[in-house]
């Protein structure tokens, strides 16, 4: 349990946590995830690793797919009301992430449930009863709600219900401990109050640091396009790890590897004393993560690819060619999607604007380009990772 305690940003109340551990009983560890996007990022994976650790200590992991709460939208850390997701989109996202999550967690001591199973069945009377478990004053203790209230920014009643629904989830699954990112601490603590309202022993709240995205500034998020997908290729995962700012790699070491905190500190000291180059330490991180997600051979291949393409500036021997349309000017997003470099025009626009597109190693940020400038040129999309997949390297020509 030391592994988890060393990495937790908060354990509240600690006395209750110690009492649960001393009870020697198998505990029910709750983690709720709202399927608001179709992929699993390293940010999600960091928390799922913590849940898996609890399983390895002999406890039961209770994974709640927030198919109901995803329709409401988690207001944590938001300065404005979130857009409402439709149920079809949520169901599609669930179908995408569920198999990935099942492969991360151990099959033994695992329960996966949807909170739609009980929240959708609450009657008006049930909702009134649930609402009476807290007060407006308590809700406004939340920093984000308080800030929006003071700034006269809209707060919908639906947003007030989100943490209540999350708390009711803890009642439904009889959670002993609930884990989550540190931005969830207030919600998890409210869950204690909701459980007490329903005459249950209150859960312990255990939170972990939020993994910062590849931009080095904001938390990893699919909506911000600063994320690393755990289903990406080993080469891309490794390359994206190598692209993160040096100062945040320690968070990745802490949350995404099994190294002891003392071992991570030794790596820090080796850099501080100029014994090691941060770049070399980051290569260790990349190999750790790719090895865990794939295997050691894939990690070695990913590292070799990174060094060949990025450091040695080598390109693949074979580059597919595509015939250019008979037009004077081409709209790059459309072309990149048609020839398979990007999956959609919107993805192409986003990556071009972010400076991730090159024509013969020269960065290009315009959305339109003269056809002659593309002929017999190598088009390279970096996906914000400083390394190109072979499938994202193309040449335009008159074939």
Predicted region positions:
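N-terminal catalytic cores of NTP/NDP-binding nucleotidyl/phosphoryl-transfer enzymes
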Residues: 11-74, 179-185, 191
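Short, conserved acidic/polar surface loops in the N-terminal third of protein domains
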Residues: 72-77, 123-125
